[in-house]
Amino acid sequence: KIPIPTHDKRFSGGMREVEQEVHRVQFLDPATGTGTFVAEAIQQIYDKMKGQQGLWNSYVENHLLPRINGFELLMASYAMAHLKLDLLLKQTGYTGTKNQRFRIYLTNSLEEYHKDTGTLFANWLSAEASEANQIKRDAPVMIVAGNPPYSGISSNNGEWISKLIEDYKYVDGEHFNERKHWLNDDYVKFIRYGQHFIEKNGSGILAYINPHGFLGNPTFRGMRWNLLKTFDKIYTIDLHGNSNIKEESPDGSPDINVFDIQQGVSINIFIKTSKKTESKLSDVFHLDLYGKREEKYQFLVDKSFSMIPFNKLNPEKPYFFFKNS
């Protein structure tokens, strides 16, 4: 059971907390945008339940919507996410019987929960923030996934996330003593944020697509060390496509980014079980994927996770690289 914010005009701020049972497996996209990752998660679940249409309505209301969470900072994207999910569920044949909202909230993921939210926002937004705070504080988030923003010059410099990032500046207890580094990039903060949720829960999966620089840049050695200590298994698919360094395929042919951006990107999956001990570092598995954009897309569509030919790495001091040397 966890405390859930509930509307009650008899209490200060019009809200009170009531203990309720929640599903143990909770999904969170901390940078939901227009809801693409959340929509795909719902679509995948629906596809597995085809042929059980009679159960779908009940499943959505009692077991799906209570598990799916998303945070978004921008009002326009937040509104679009709600519209996209509403249309998707209607297309699946879902017809709601309860007045149940999507658990997509207007909030900044990288800010810690605020206990006195009611004094900070207008009434309608106060309830929104209170429910987001409950997830930040209490929800047993076991899956964190998405495509968080990238920004080398981050404006998310709050005390809470900055303190968490400090952990990435140490390797085996020693500070890395660098003043110029890229640990303040937003995507690094979102990885640390997701890691924090999984650590707090004791087990879970963190899965992002984000810039690939942290895989092999020496300045990220403390970050890699910290991830090695936290997780049991780490899988990375380096999609390359970095036009900043004019990446090419090994055969000299063009290597194209999967997105219309200059930074190369990678798919990263971090898995933690309750059996993990800090003394044992994570196993790391890696794959390089070069070539045309369409070829990369096709590979990812055709291959199930078990079919991907990962290479096992052996990250070593002093840099603990997550890529082939």
What residue ranges belong to the model's regions?
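SAM-dependent methyltransferase catalytic region
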Residues: K1-T236, K246
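Sequence-level detector for compositionally biased, low-complexity segments
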Residues: S155-W160, L164, E174-E178, H196-S325
